[in-house]
Regions:
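Alpha-helical transmembrane bundles and membrane-interface segments of multipass inner-membrane proteins
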Residues: 1-184
Length: 184
């Protein structure tokens, strides 16, 4: 793959992350405009849409901590997002499962980061339950993070071999434009 193709593909991953962030934010906006807090609409026997706010992290961790957690989770999400952008930039093209994983996790982190910065809490609205047992409400960003984690695990088992990675890097070095020190 040529250097310019690899560069274009890298931006495609960032564009995909941006699309997921937009979908996440639009869905949260729709829920906030359509529901009162805690209002529920049944979609399926095991699925409702509802509007709940989470001031904490996953499963409402630290949600009652008094407000400081907003800044802690904002800092963590910001740092993770920066690391993921750099990581995606450094990956080689054959690492598709890992690229998908990191793109989804990046989108989810940014989606929830936007909520924390603008609202001080995260908007959740998808509620699964069965026989009186409820899974914590979640959103599109949370789903992206979860699916990204699954892809990351898949990469561990089915990702490219060391030989494939070396071949891809060698191909990029061979096709690198003169004077370009960036090989990815």
């Amino acid at each position: 793959m040529s250097h310019s193709n690899n560069h274009s593909l890298r931006w495609a991953w960032y564009a995909l992350a941006a699309v997921i962030v937009v979908l996440d934010q639009l869905s949260k906006y729709w829920v906030q405009m359509s529901f009162f807090e805690f209002e529920r609409i049944n979609l399926l026997p095991i699925l409702d849409f509802t509007l709940v706010y989470n001031k904490g992290a996953a499963w409402s961790f630290l949600s009652e901590a008094g407000g400081w957690q907003r800044w802690l989770f904002t800092a963590i999400s910001s740092a993770v997002s920066i690391v993921l952008v750099v990581w995606i930039h450094r990956l080689v093209a054959v690492q598709k499962l890992l690229l998908i994983a990191l793109t989804l996790i990046l989108a989810g982190a940014i989606g929830n980061l936007i909520d924390r910065v603008l609202l001080g809490k995260v908007v959740d609205f998808v509620l699964f339950y069965y026989d009186g047992h409820y899974f914590p409400a979640f959103n599109v960003a949370d789903s992206a993070i979860t699916v990204g984690a699954i892809f990351m695990l898949a990469d561990v088992f089915w990702g490219p071999s060391e030989a494939d990675l070396k071949a891809d890097v060698n191909e990029q070095v061979k096709n690198k434009p003169e004077g370009d020190s960036n090989v990815r």
